Amino acid sequence: EAWLKLVAQIEKVRGSRGYTDRSGRPRAPEMLLDRLKENNLRNLCNNAVAVGGTFGARHYLPSIDLIGNPRLDLVMDAHSGQGHRPIAIDTLIHKLDPALKPAKRGEPFQVVVHTLYRQKSFFTEANDGTLYADEVECLLDLHEARLEQQALEFLEKLTPRKNS
């Protein structure tokens, strides 16, 4: 029940913007993630952009039933970067892949940027320095990508079991 309430209120918690490649030769989400991990892009993010979606879900639950990655979900902390210049998402997207442009209605997304408006992001840093969005953000990304079976599997992992 709490999950349904959260999904119904999602626009109040975060905003999303999709990007697509109209060149006819889109890069694989894995390639885009590798580019994001390069030092110059990581520094541009000022620790305010984390990986979510299928990549994030797999970070938290390696056994999740996923075949491939349909897109790269990024989560930007709108309250991060105090003392730093604000992150220009369009600049970051252009550096990831110059062919990525804001998607029009009905176009598939190669990258989706979700902007968090809450006070704390709860990002987790992996051993390689990659920031991952928290489990709830990854769950919302799976739902938004219409990966319902995987979202339910991930939700089950997140739901504490009561001892009977």
Residue spans for each PLM region:
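Short gly/ser-rich loop at a beta-strand->alpha-helix junction or flexible surface loop bordering the NTP-binding
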Residues: 3-115
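C-terminal regulatory/effector modules of DNA-binding transcriptional regulators
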Residues: 79-164
